[in-house]
Amino acid sequence: MTQSEILEVAKSQSGMTQKEFAEYFGIPYRTVQDWFAGRRNMPDYVLRLMIYKLEMEKKVQGLSKELEQN
């Protein structure tokens, strides 16, 4: 998969728009647009960190829901 395809999957799973995705990570919207369009590539470590943050956020939300139920 290309970086832009991986980003699209991550964005879709997060339920965010491109603009929300950019704001969430504190990245200029135009840069994010270029990443999604494949006009610009980011360093691989940035992509890994973004995915890691999304995964951890999802886990934290899951734990919060569990705690609320108890």
Predicted regions located by residue number:
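Recognition helix of helix-turn-helix/homeodomain-like DNA-binding domains
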Residues: 27-41
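Short acidic DE-rich linear segments
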Residues: 62-70
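Short alpha-helical "recognition helix" segments of helix-turn-helix
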Residues: 20-22
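Alpha-helical structural elements of signaling/regulatory helical domains
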Residues: 16, 41-42
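A short, Lys/Arg-rich alpha-helix, primarily the initiator
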Residues: 1-13, 51-52
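DNA major-groove recognition helix of helix-turn-helix/homeodomain DNA-binding modules
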Residues: 44-63
